[in-house]
Amino acid sequence: MGPRLHLITNGVFTTSIAGGDIHFLKLAEGAARAGYQVNLFGGHALREVVAQHQLPATVTLTDEDRMARVDQGALSGQVAMFRDFYGRFRRTLQLLPSIAPEDYAYAVSDYWFDVLPVVRSRAQRRLMVLHMEAPSFAQIVTRGRPDVDPKRLASLHYWASQEYSLRRFCAATRAQGQPVRRHLFYLHPLMEPRLQRLGLAPAERTLLSYGLEVGPTEAVPAQERIYDAVWIGRVHRQKGIEDLLATLQFLAARLSGFRVMMIGNVREAMLPLLAGRGLEKHLEFSGFVSEEEKIRLFKASRCFLMPSRHEGSPRVIGESLIAETPVVAYEIPNYRPLFGDFVRYAPPFDLRAFQQAAQTEIQRMRSGENYLRKMDLARFKMENRWETTQEKFLQALKGLGNGAG
């Protein structure tokens, strides 16, 4: 039997999983296929997710039941979530003797409830991932970054957790008197200077892609482009909702038969914002859709609008690109290192420039001109497909010693 790989996944509290959850599930899937014995520490919600995805892995339960639904924006809800995370963290510490020195331990987030159990374990082969840079303390105080919550509590927790967890992971060099082998994955090139300052050598870190479903996307047939624009995301100021709606108004006034598809369960949150804008007849809401249907809707659209004010490594841009749907976005710092010239950029946050760029791309697509057909999408797909991401993960495991296969 192959080596044991433990994933510490205490942040999963619902079966509605997000990008980071998909990331660790895909990595675990690749490790299991390569012969590793995969075990996940987490709660009852995680166990349901593992079953839904048919992941060949065991689950070591760290809670007694799923957390009841709470309002995550309210102070009471944030306190309830912290208590829930702490409960799973405490139970994980009690179960750490089940991790042997020769095992691998991987923290699937940069939060304390995943990283500290890895640091405190007996495992001499340790891994963690940095998905996104937390806002700085100054950005939190001034709300200088759009993803800082109004109460600032969640953002302070994120900042403090990431700072402490990274430093603890990088400072832990021995376990039970034996040297520790460590490896850190990061999802954006701009994170490299920070990791260098923390003392991580190039051989101790790997840049991983956010991962794309290239095969399933190519399996969906080409569609008639019946929607001029498509949008997917949360209804949050970080996503540039006001600029999105202003752009839709701008386009509806200038393009005959203008149609927009909004993917996801956003109708209820969007409707109050649409009042008085005259957009109702131009919009369609998909509601919750399968992965295959999401791909089909991208392929049925002429342009993906991305007016976000801040993002980390947004997989959704890559999803649009491999569906050969042009992307118009503000040129915020994180985009070009990941997507280069595959995106049509507008200066941040020049609304008129964004609107004009969107109009130009839609008109070109209406006339049959798609700039992506002239670009090396094959290379982009190869670099960002899940298989490549899984291969890099396995290489890091083998580099720590006793690799399967």
Residue ranges and their predicted role:
Residues 288-289, 296-301:
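Short alpha-helical donor nucleotide-sugar binding micro-motif in glycosyltransferases
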Residues 307-309:
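Aromatic "clamp/platform" in nucleotide-sugar-dependent glycosyltransferases that forms part
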